[in-house]
A protein has these predicted regions:
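N-terminal-proximal low-complexity accessory segments that begin disordered
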Residues: 12-69
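Catalytic and substrate-binding clefts that recognize carbohydrates or anionic sugar/phosphate headgroups
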Residues: 2-13, 23, 46-49, 60-62, ...
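Catalytic core of carbohydrate-active enzymes
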Residues: 502-507, 511-513, 519-530, 540-543, ...
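Residue-level recognition of beta-strand termini and adjacent short loop/turns
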Residues: 36, 72-76, 111
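Active-site-proximal structural scaffolding
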Residues: 63, 239-240, 248, 277-279, ...
């Protein structure tokens, strides 16, 4: 759709023509403010606007008033809730999982003209300015501005960084952002639901990060995002597998929009003076999270939506996969060679080829190619390998479970008579020619139990240790679901799906872990997630890191990616891999929380003899670093930190780092600078202080750039601080089964440190 000259209407998906039978309602100054059960309730009148491009009140339409509930929680959280529907504010739902520290703070009012909202601990958390704006009147050329709710919030009590509602306009009739508003359908049947909006003021130099696995540059200011999960189809476009309705601002606050609806977020884009949020449902539920550091804010977000669970030790080892292995013999040959040639590895993953028919997911092994699945899994276990299996949440036409699923309504049901239109996989990375009859309905408890105990448990009982919960970004949108509309379910479906798989895996296999692609708020509780179908190229490598950094700034601790990218180019399935990309992606993978080789053609390193020795050395380094990785992971599960950390987490006042998306901290000690080009060169920025190259021992001073450094193919720039202590494992192993972490040693980066030999 072409952009109009009225950006507010563009943002609100609004057409002022009468034919649409929709109206914008703008919030006015509060008509009433009161204390109620520890909350502050602000009655906000809304005035309907005329159907014209120059906004003006429709004085013939009576105002409608709705309550804005302001609630505070320890620590440093303010909640804003208003609904034009019949929704009720709740502290318990699928997205929310409050930590014990999150306790309500009673609020009370002080003052009248300038009304302060003060917490029981004495902190001023908001101001409602009811004073009359000052004027020096000399002209009647333009109408006077409409009344405005002037409300400013201070979630951590710091009045120097107030978050104010934004009434942003060029002239009184020409609005760019509304502080609060909604769109009504005027009682006319429409395909579009009612929509509600809220806006906050932002500064000219303000930066924004987060919003999910965003394959974009680090600073997201000047961009608008449609928060609707969809198959990303790679990592170099606007689509997104994992949208998270949360952002973090360089002014040191975060905003979490508690919704599963389709929504839009404009970060100083439609208006450069405003952050604007649009929810395609007539309810707004916003948590403003304060803090002194990004880690404080991210921890506050996790305190609302849940902390990640700790994955098992073996999951931090190397995973080997391909799309796909087709037989037990093929898999066992690969596992034998990994052991024979001393490539350390913990997990073998079977993708789409373990079924009776490739891609026809029936949760059962092909009896011809896997004649003894129990013996197959046992033999791999004896060799130190865990088994991971691919599946997806749709029941295909022809699947043996279809009739049972339809009869018992375990899958979504067509909303109209006739053959259902499959919108769950259309235009996506599902490369099968199958038709899907329905989406497993996780809003229905009986369907969830059927999935957990009828489909997954028999596999887990055999000894399978991980389920790849692929897809889940899309559902059948033309179907009916037990306890939700498809519009409200689509985004949160990933959470319900992954929770079910995670819970039964932990219950039966003993280890809580999945391998998931989609995501929404709360999914970080059920690790782990990987970055989807990246291109095996320099662009795919760079895009993957960007996505991982933003996901870590959206509450996720654990994240992986396909090494060395998922698909080939230009021939998706058949073009050979670039060996330099293979090495550089391997080096990057060693310094991420989890490391899986996967893709459309052969990924085993011996197929690339020119680089196999380099790859093996980096694999061995990965296992030597596991004590450090486990230590940092345990800390991440209790804090706000991810494993892959944007530099801004540690240096929020350094303006440079809000623009750096090709370097990162791995845990709290390593500064990692992947090489992402065939020239084997890169620029490096080192934050202030002294730094030591972990591989060579070279000392460098920070607070500056180092330009055009040459990096040999077998090296990657990795830096640590002087006096850092790095836990390492002193022995080579074949898998984590061979490790006794009590034998770990501590490497101190002192004056005698000359680097770690690969």
């Amino acid at each position: 759709m072409k952009q109009t000259n009225y950006h507010l209407f563009d943002f609100m998906d609004f057409d002022p023509s009468l034919q649409k039978k929709e109206s914008i309602w703008k919030a006015y100054a509060p008509s009433k403010i009161e204390e109620r059960d520890g909350d502050i309730v602000v009655t906000v009148p809304y005035q309907k606007q005329l159907h014209q491009e120059d906004m003006a009140p429709d004085v013939d339409a009576p105002q409608q008033s709705y309550d804005l509930i302001i609630r505070a929680y320890e620590p440093n959280i303010i909640r804003l809730f208003t609904t034009m529907a019949d929704d009720v504010m709740t502290d318990e739902d699928d997205m929310l999982q409050f930590a014990p520290e999150v306790q309500r703070l009673p609020l009370h009012l002080q003052g009248s003209v300038c009304c302060d909202i003060v917490a029981a601990n004495g902190k001023k958390l908001a101001t409602i300015d009811l004073s009359t704006p000052r004027l020096d009147h000399w002209s009647d050329l333009l109408p006077a501005p409409q009344p405005v709710p002037f409300i400013t919030f201070y979630p951590d009590g710091d009045e120097t960084k107030g978050i104010a509602l934004s009434d942003d306009h060029f002239s009184p009739p020409r609005y760019d952002a509304l502080p609060l508003g909604f769109v009504s359908c005027d009682g006319i049947a429409t395909n579009r639901t009612e929509r509600a909006t809220i806006s906050f003021k932002c500064n000219p130099d303000e930066h924004f990060v987060g919003t999910g696995e965003r394959f974009r540059k680090m600073d997201l200011s000047g961009q608008t995002f449609q928060l609707k999960n969809q198959d990303g189809q790679g990592v170099n476009n606007r689509r997104c597998y994992k949208n998270i309705p949360f952002y973090l601002s360089s002014r040191m606050y975060g905003a979490f929009f508690h919704t599963s609806d389709y929504c839009k977020l404009s970060l100083a884009d439609h208006s450069t003076r405003s952050v604007q949020f649009l929810n395609e449902h007539a309810t707004l539920d916003v948590f403003l999270i304060g803090g002194r550091t990004p880690e404080d804010i991210l921890r506050g977000y996790r305190m609302l939506t849940g902390f990640p669970a700790m994955p098992p030790l073996w999951s931090f080892g190397i995973w080997m996969s391909r799309m796909t292995y087709f037989s037990a013999d093929e898999v066992e040959d690969i596992c034998h060679r990994l052991r024979e040639e001393h490539y350390p590895c913990d997990v073998i993953h079977l993708d789409t080829g373990w079924f009776r028919t490739d891609w026809l997911c029936e949760w059962k092994f092909n009896p011809e190619r896997f004649p003894d699945p129990q013996g197959f899994i046992n033999r791999l276990k004896d060799s130190g390998f865990k088994v991971s299996l691919w599946q997806l949440p749709y029941i295909a036409q022809g699947a043996e479970q279809l009739e049972e699923a339809k009869k018992n309504k375990y899958i979504s049901q067509p909303a109209v008579d006739g053959f259902p239109i499959d919108e769950s996989t259309g235009g996506s990375s599902n490369f099968s020619a199958l038709d899907y009859a329905g989406t497993i309905d996780f809003t229905y408890d009986k369907a969830t139990d059927w999935y957990k105990y009828h489909l997954l448990k028999p596999l887990l009982d055999m000894g399978v240790k991980c389920i790849k919960t692929d897809f889940g970004e899309n559902i059948h949108m033309d179907h009916q679901y037990h306890a939700s509309t498809p519009e409200r379910l689509n985004n949160i479906y990933a959470l319900l799906y992954q929770k079910a798989a995670y819970e039964v895996t932990r219950e039966v296999a003993g280890d809580g872990i999945i391998w998931a692609r989609a995501g929404w708020a709360g999914c970080q509780r059920y690790p782990l997630h990987w970055g989807g179908d990246s291109e095996s190229s320099w662009a795919g490598l760079a895009g993957s890191l960007k996505g991982g950094l933003h996901l870590g700034l959206s509450g996720f601790a654990f994240w992986s990616h396909d090494v060395p990218g998922f698909h080939s180019t230009p021939d998706f399935m058949n073009s050979p891999l670039d060996e330099q990309v293979y090495v550089r992606w391997t080096q990057f993978g060693v310094f991420t929380s989890h490391m899986r080789y996967h893709g459309t053609c052969k990924r085993e390193p011996w197929h690339y003899p020119n680089i196999a020795p380099i790859v093996k050395r980096w694999w061995k380094l990965r296992y030597r670093l596991l004590p450090y990785i486990i230590e940092q992971s345990e800390q991440a599960c209790q804090s706000g930190l991810p494993l892959v950390q944007a530099l801004l987490i540690h240096h929020p006042k350094d303006r440079q780092v809000w623009h750096i998306d090709d370097e990162y901290y791995f845990g709290n000690e390593f500064l990692v600078c992947p090489v992402m080009n065939k020239e084997n060169r890169r620029d490096i920025y080192l934050p202030k202080g002294s730094w030591v190259n972990f591989l060579t021992g070279e000392r460098l001073e920070g607070g500056r750039w180092y330009y055009d450094l040459e990096v040999p193919l077998d090296q990657m720039p990795i830096f640590v601080r002087p006096d850092a202590v790095i836990k390492m494992y002193p022995h080579d192993v074949d898998s984590t089964d061979d490790m006794d972490l009590s034998q770990s040693i501590a490497i101190t980066i002192n004056n005698d440190f000359n680097g770690i030999a690969l």
